[in-house]
């Protein structure tokens, strides 16, 4: 993994054999201008506000400069719980429209899965033998609706043989939320209260990493098989895009694939 450039963050975990996982940083060799500078990778629909032609050029540069085995499977993310399975047929056909989903799984060698974020939590799942992977866009809505549990269930590997990596996201000392977010978790599960710390009446800091660990463990993963966390997108403007911090912001990608 040492072959990757400085504008790439390689996952800090004991990677299963053949599994590659990384997140891009905003300072990569992109063409987007402020406030999307420079390597903004989404969305081509213009949702993030950047010119679609810039996003397309950035995505092309990403594939070329990282030497990716194939064009990533970009998703139309909607803060939902839909999981896309990338099989050999889907990998082989041209991708004209981004499928609507907030997670993807595959066992196809060389298929590159991608998640776009700018404060939401990107999560990568992998079988310990490297036979299967999944990626998840886990914002607070998705976490509350258990997108992680649904993705674990979509994988063919038994949960005790899975491991997870939590990528850069809004940190627990920077991401303040209101009653709606607090209630979405605590009214369903009182144990989620430990992931919230009061900042002022009716407001809390929320620990997305803690909530993700709770849900992954509930889905059957062991605590020792969950890695990452601790990189705050809001407090690190040099490296990460942040919607909460900047409002108009680009998106960085978390990519995963099974190497040949």
From Swiss-Prot:
Catalysed reaction equations from the record:
adenosine + phosphate = alpha-D-ribose 1-phosphate + adenine; S-methyl-5'-thioadenosine + phosphate = 5-(methylsulfanyl)-alpha-D-ribose 1-phosphate + adenine; inosine + phosphate = alpha-D-ribose 1-phosphate + hypoxanthine; adenosine + H2O + H(+) = inosine + NH4(+)
Record's keyword annotation contains Metal-binding: yes
Which UniProt keywords are given for this protein, alphabetically ordered? Copper, Hydrolase, Metal-binding, Oxidoreductase, Transferase, Zinc
InterPro entries annotated for this entry?
Answer: Cu_polyphenol_OxRdtase, Cu_polyphenol_OxRdtase_sf, Cytotoxic_necrot_fac-like_cat
What GO annotations for molecular function exist for this entry? adenosine deaminase activity; copper ion binding; oxidoreductase activity; S-methyl-5-thioadenosine phosphorylase activity
> Could you say which EC number(s) this protein's record lists?
2.4.2.1, 3.5.4.4, 2.4.2.28
Which domain of life does this protein belong to?
Bacteria
Tell me yes or no: is Cytoplasm among this UniProt entry's keywords.
no
Q: Which cofactor does it need?
A: Cu(2+); Zn(2+)
Q: Which CDD domains match?
A: YfiH
What are the binding positions for Zn(2+) in this chain?
A: 79, 120, 137
Q: What is the stated purpose of this protein?
A: Purine nucleoside enzyme that catalyzes the phosphorolysis of adenosine and inosine nucleosides, yielding D-ribose 1-phosphate and the respective free bases, adenine and hypoxanthine. Also catalyzes the phosphorolysis of S-methyl-5'-thioadenosine into adenine and S-methyl-5-thio-alpha-D-ribose 1-phosphate. Also has adenosine deaminase activity.
Q: Which family does the similarity line name?
A: Belongs to the purine nucleoside phosphorylase YfiH/LACC1 family.
On assembly, the entry states: Homodimer.
Can you say what this protein is called?
Purine nucleoside phosphorylase XF_0940
- What is the native source organism of this protein? Xylella fastidiosa (strain 9a5c)
């Amino acid at each position: 993994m040492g072959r990757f450039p400085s504008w790439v963050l390689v996952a800090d975990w004991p990677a299963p054999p053949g599994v590659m996982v990384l997140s891009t940083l905003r300072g990569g060799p992109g063409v987007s201008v402020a406030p999307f500078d420079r390597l903004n990778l989404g969305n081509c629909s213009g949702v993030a506000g950047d010119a679609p032609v810039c996003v397309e050029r950035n995505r092309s540069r990403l594939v070329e400069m990282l030497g990716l085995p194939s064009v990533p499977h970009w998703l139309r993310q909607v803060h939902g719980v839909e999981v896309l399975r990338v099989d050999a047929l889907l990998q082989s056909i041209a991708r004209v429209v981004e499928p609507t989903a907030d997670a993807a799984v595959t066992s196809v060698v060389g298929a590159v899965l991608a998640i776009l974020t700018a404060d939401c939590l990107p999560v990568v799942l992998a079988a310990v033998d490297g036979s299967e992977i999944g990626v998840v866009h886990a914002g607070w809505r998705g976490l509350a609706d258990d997108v992680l549990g649904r993705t674990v269930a979509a994988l063919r590997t038994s949960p005790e043989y899975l491991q997870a990596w939590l990528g850069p996201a809004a940190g627990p000392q920077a991401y303040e939320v209101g009653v709606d977010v607090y209630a979405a978790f605590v009214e369903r599960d009182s144990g989620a209260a430990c992931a919230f710390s009061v900042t002022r009446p009716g407001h809390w800091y929320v620990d997305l990493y803690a909530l993700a660990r709770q849900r992954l463990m509930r889905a059957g993963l062991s605590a020792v098989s969950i890695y990452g966390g601790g990189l705050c997108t809001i407090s690190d403007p040099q490296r990460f895009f942040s919607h909460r911090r900047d409002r108009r912001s680009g998106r960085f990608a978390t990519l995963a694939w099974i190497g040949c």
